[in-house]
Amino acid sequence: AITNRGSQFRIPTFICGDKSDFDGRIVVLRKSNQQNNIIQFHSDIRSNKIEKLNKNSKAAMLFYDKEEKIQVRLKVECTINHENDITKESWLKTGHMSRKCYLVDNGPGTESDNPTSGLKPELDNFEFTMEQSEVGYKNFTVIQCKVKSFEWLYLAAKGHRRAKFDLENNKESWLVP
């Protein structure tokens, strides 16, 4: 799904927080490591999800493919990578258009008096070089999500099917949908 830009499983909802303050948002998966059950996406270090993950590293991810009629729910433990070998490797693979997100002066969610991209006018239309985009690296993070368990649900008119996979305890079971 990660290498297939058209896959619905490439853009899950990521949900993090605690009992009284949780939030969800769409993320774009960038890499997976099936051997270690890790998936990762990029974020801005100034995003409020980083603050939430620093308080509680446990999160959930929700995937849904309407055509396949499949829903997958993951329970994950997150690691925030910032200015380390993991972010360096990912930053080098991040394209010109994607780097633009990390060039804003103020972090995501900062209030503004007017509608804005947050970019300086000279950057708003991709009028910057890859070299100039290096300034954004200081804001770039890679969030790695270690999958602890997941549930699979297939929706069918003749009857749904549901299964749970506990990766920590190596247990699988069918569930009533």
What label would you give each PLM region?
Residues 9-11, 24, 36, 69, ...:
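Sequence-level motif detector for i,i+2 pairs with an aromatic at +2
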Residues 16-20, 63-67, 154-156, 167:
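Short acidic, glycine-rich loop/turn motifs
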Residues 5, 10, 64-65, 103:
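A short, aromatic/hydrophobic, helix- or strand-capping loop or linear motif
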Residues 1-36, 40, 51-52:
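An N-terminal domain-cap segment
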Residues 71-177:
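Charged, gly/pro-rich active-site loop segments
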Residues 17, 44, 64, 146-148:
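Structured loops at beta-to-helix junctions and adjacent beta-edge loops in soluble globular domains
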Residues 30-69:
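A short mixed-secondary-structure module that forms the rim of ligand-binding clefts
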Residues 11, 37, 56-59, 139-142, ...:
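Short, surface-exposed beta-edge/turn micro-motifs
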